[in-house]
Amino acid sequence: MQDGSVTTPFGRRSMTLGMLASQYMSRELEPETSADKWKLFRALCEAKPKLGISERALSVMNALLSFYPETTLSEENGLIVFPSNMQLSLRAHGMAEATLRRHIAALVDAGLLARRDSPNGKRYARKDGDGSIDEAYGFSLAPLLSRAREIEQIAAYVKIERLQLRRLRERLTICRRDIGKLIEVAIEEGVDGNWDGIHQHYRSLVATIPRVATAATVAPILEEMEMLREEISNLLEIRLKIENLSGNPDQIERHKQNSHPESTNEFEPSSREEQGERPSPAIEPQREPMKVFPLGMVLRACPSISDYGPGGVVASPRDLMQAAVVVRSMLCVSPSAYQDACEVMGPENASAVMACILERSGHIKSPGGYLRDLTSRAKRGEFSPGPVLMALLRARGGSDRLAS
């Protein structure tokens, strides 16, 4: 503003606090402040969503900037442009006068433009004897210049957010493709599981994806999708492990040999002294497979697990493994923690342990941490599901006697 005073609109247009704030901000503009008008305009276009201005309003701002004679906006060159409505309409690609006024008002309300109206409301400039502009009435670009740094920061943030959204969308697309194909192969191969329910859950997640998405709305949906993909992958992995155990004669033979330690074979020590030696503590106890407990025993000790089997029934070890995957998700146990337990204890014992954790879930603050602790102990040979199952059986037997 040339004289630093507050100006009010001409005619019936009323003054607003927003217009007043823009003028006060312009008065605080440092004399040395400057900015390339077209770079600033590009940043303004980038920051458009956060500033709440439309593309048509940006067209009007572009036209106004084209009337500024210099490339660099600065107080030294003056910040008032004074085109007539006809000239402005031509530069704004023939925009109607009523539309032009509406978008100018939007720019003023957004704090990007200020009116400097003459006594009669017309836009013009008065020059001095040297031909320099002495007084001008029209639109002040001072608010735009005063917010240059803010606009550039917003534009940078919008770029980062757009890049983040693009990456999230890419991950979401890959995840959707993976889930669709994994469900398809599970159904084609006849893998046990409630695949109709899983597919319905997947479709419900897809339905929550908004048409106009942001990083904040896509991130939680992607997290749910990735958890679902992990659960499907675990179910298929369990199926593959079961097939490997049942279909590999060498593994079956080794299992039989390990189940009868009194039998001799070619790997036994040759001398009596060696035969009488106790195993060295340095040998890891987990070289021997952990004992698998009968399904009936697990179900008597942990009856709650049956509710999570296919159709609400656990009738086989495979059903127990599938129920354990559902319980893992319900108790917020991470897939990696359960996978580690399967690798250390075997899938049958890991599912039995999950059944025990479910049975005692009211007394366990962190099921995931508890499972990791049991896995570590099992790796050192310090844990077996047997004592836990027996304790639950004894507790259930006592409660049954009290109930009777």
Swiss-Prot record:
Record keywords, A-Z: DNA replication, Plasmid
Keyword Flavoprotein attached: no
UniProt entry tagged with the keyword Cell division: no
A Pfam family it matches: RP-C_C
Disulphide bonds in the chain: none
GO terms of biological process kind: DNA replication
Coiled-coil intervals, chain numbering: none
Highest taxon in the source lineage: Bacteria
Stretches the record annotates as Disordered: 249-287
Record-stated family: To A.rhizogenes possible replication protein C (RepC).
UniProt protein name: Putative replication protein C
UniProt source species: Sinorhizobium fredii (strain NBRC 101917 / NGR234)
Lineage of producing organism: Bacteria, Pseudomonadati, Pseudomonadota, Alphaproteobacteria, Hyphomicrobiales
